[in-house]
Amino acid sequence: MEAKDVNYCVILAGGIGSRLWPVSRKELPKQFLDWFGTGRTLLQQTYDRFRKIIDAKHIFIVTNEHYADLVREQLPDVAQDRILKEPIRRNTLPSVAWATTCISHLCPHGNVIVSPADQLILEENNFDNDVLKGLDFVGHSDCLLTMGVKPTRPDTGYGYIQAHENMEEGAFARVKSFTEKPALDFARVFMESGEFY
């Protein structure tokens, strides 16, 4: 079996986008908007990005049942059984657990990348290469891999990954700590330390 045959992607598209109100609303959250005027919504851009490196039938979309029609409208080529509709919102962990359980029934030793539907990636070729490098790494290691970028400003809307040691760009390191959405004071300390991604 080729490596690409065991690579899967889960795109999380169930958020309500409340931080970007009034443009992003509960009825039409940011992942379903053409945020940057490209002619493609954030969800479509994320799907397109992963479709270049992962087989289309290996891409799952997790969304709230209220957004299932929007997903089908924006991604008509995605098979119905690849759109997982949550009856209620329970944040990230249950969404990831459900999707990876579905994938494990199809491919018990699959490599899975989980991505939000609403991220901005400016250097897509570098991103693609890093994702492929990460999938190759987990394919030969018994581990979880999280990818991060150096913060450019303190932000309370993101998690912060602390590496065990300083590392060069594109390298792998063990995670020392992870802090989910810290208070602004901590986010500032994390950013200024240079140890966090």
Positions of predicted regions on the chain:
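Conserved N-terminal catalytic core of the sugar/cofactor nucleotidyltransferase
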Residues: 1-11, 22-26, 37-116, 122-125, ...
